[in-house]
Every structure is written in C-alpha cells, then in structure tokens.
Amino acid sequence: NAMCDSRQLTTSRHPGTTLDVNAILHHDYLLYDTPGLTREDSLLTHVDDRLLKQVIPLKPLKPRVYQLYEASTMSLGGLVRLDLIGCEQVSCVAYFSENLKLHRSKQPKAEELWKKHYAEMLSPTIASLEEQQRFEHHGVDGKLDVVIHGLGWFCISGKLDEIVVYVPKNGNVTFRKAMI
C-alpha cells in the first residue's frame, strides 16, 4: 500500500503478510491490524501456495457431524488421520475448510486405506506417508476438542478408549476441553 500511495487495505490468503500496524475505523471503534507471529507448528505455514485456497476457509465454518458406532477413522484429505479407538457411540464434529474432503472409514482398515490411497483419494498432502508423526490421548468420557494447528478442529463427544492423530512432521495437535 505504501508503494502505491494508497490508504486502502489489501488482503492476502498468505499468512503473516501484515507488515505494519494498521488502524481501521469501524463505526465508533478503532481496530488495529498488526503483524502476527509465524508458528512453525502450524500446518498452514507448510502448505504450498497453490493449496492455500483449499485449506483456508472462504466461508464461515459449517460443522460436519458424524455419528460413530464402532472404531472409526476420519481422514482430512491426506493431511490428518484421526483414529477413534474403543468407541461404542461417539459424535465427531469437524470444523475445517469446506474445500477439504473428509473421509470416514473403519479404523482397523485405516492403515491399508492410507497406504493404498494416499495422495490420490486422500489429498491434498504436504509430506510423504513416512513423514507423519503420531499424537495420542487416552480415555475420553465427555467432550474433547482435537485441534490441528493451522487447519481447524474435531469435537469428540462420548466415551472411547483412545484417540490417535497422525499429521505431517511439522504439524502439531492439541487436546483440550471442548469449547462448543
């Protein structure tokens, strides 16, 4: 904006592009857009530019609700694998970009599915299948959020023995008390 002598704000889908503090007058309030911090554990930081419009939500997030009655796996493209183990009746609500495909499968067949369809049916990807890391949470009885840094989160409700999450090696996962 400074180079073209304009005071109009521009937007970018690329994270971390705000270079200076920008004051924005909105009705009777003054808002400040400030440079942010780049988080290396955010998958958004490691997504190729051509995938950003697929990963970043363009509309308000709409929850995608699944009722699960047996051990199941939720695959978010080839970016995230969520294994729900030892569940009888569990609700899984996904809050991610509408452009990322969510695939539900039986957990005992998840390994075979990922080996056979990774980077094809399970896409997009940002790392090889061998470059995945594992996060675990044991004993869920109630509501729990599984946050995938930079992408969104799953809200798990019910009782299950274990949650196992696989993400690319640069990503991170946080388990927290459900916020919704």
Question: What name fits each language-model region?
Answer:
Residues A2-I180:
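Helix-rich effector regions associated with P-loop NTPase G domains
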